[in-house]
Structure formats: C-alpha cells, structure tokens
C-alpha cells in the first residue's frame, strides 16, 4: 500500500481534524486487524480507524503510539526514518 495523506480527527487535538499519513493495516500476530490502520502523525507512528458511517479517519496519537515493542514498528519504521531530519 502506498502512503496516502488524509484528513483525520486527532486525539491530541481533542478530535479536531489534522494531517495524517495513512501507511497501511495494523497487524496483530502477523494478521491485519479489520478496520485498523497505522498512521504517521508528525514524526511518530500511531494507530487509528476509519469510521465508515461518516467516512472519516480517527487517529489516536496520544495512547495509540506504535513503538519498538509493537510488531507494526518493524513494518513501518522506515517512514519515520525518512524524515528524521525535521522536514516532515
């Protein structure tokens, strides 16, 4: 899946919309979770969902952080390494 820039409701902004990059599906035990995705917000990886009833993404960039302990980190870490020089 090619990364796509989307408008999403961000938890850190109390649900207001902001910019996020949809990277691909969220995996659990090497299987994709239905309707759960990994996003890049700023220079961090986060989880989020698509609300199909309203057609909008909701990203948890407060508590849904994907770090080194998460299996998704190894899959998507290249996207945070690309822009680690501050040009996001």
Name the predicted role of every residue range.
Residues 1-2, 78-88:
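Short intrinsically disordered terminal tails
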